[in-house]
Amino acid sequence: MLEKYSKESLTLIVALHELLGHGTGKLFQVNDKGEKNWDTEAVKNPFTGEEITTFYGAQETWSQKFGKLHSGYEECRADSVALHLIQFERPFEIFCPDQRENWDDIYYTCWLEMIY
């Protein structure tokens, strides 16, 4: 299965990992004036429903906060996004439209590729 669907599974995983895994996300931050870069009325903590209380200060960066772990943490986030999104048909419709009858096998191969 890894050999048969390697091209399709790698296309899916790499596209979702790179385009949406790395290409999405919001760094909550305040500027030098203390203004937040998100709508505080609309965006809430997804676990509590309360206002967001932790965020980056002005001039703070991702790598400053996480040090040497920042790149590994970002790769794990991108992989998680890719693995979540392959649960849905839309990526298969976009990247493997002519393989509909093989989508289950390609899906399974995606998981194998991630752990192989």
Regions found by a protein language model. Give the residues of each.
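Short pre-active-site segment immediately N-terminal to the catalytic Zn-binding motif
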Residues: 1-14
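Secondary-structure transition/capping motifs at alpha-helix termini
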Residues: 23-34, 88-97
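Post-HEXXH active-site segment of zinc metalloproteases
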Residues: 25-74
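Catalytic glutamate of the conserved HExxH
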Residues: 14, 18-23, 80
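Long, well-structured alpha-helical subdomains associated
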Residues: 62-76, 80-116
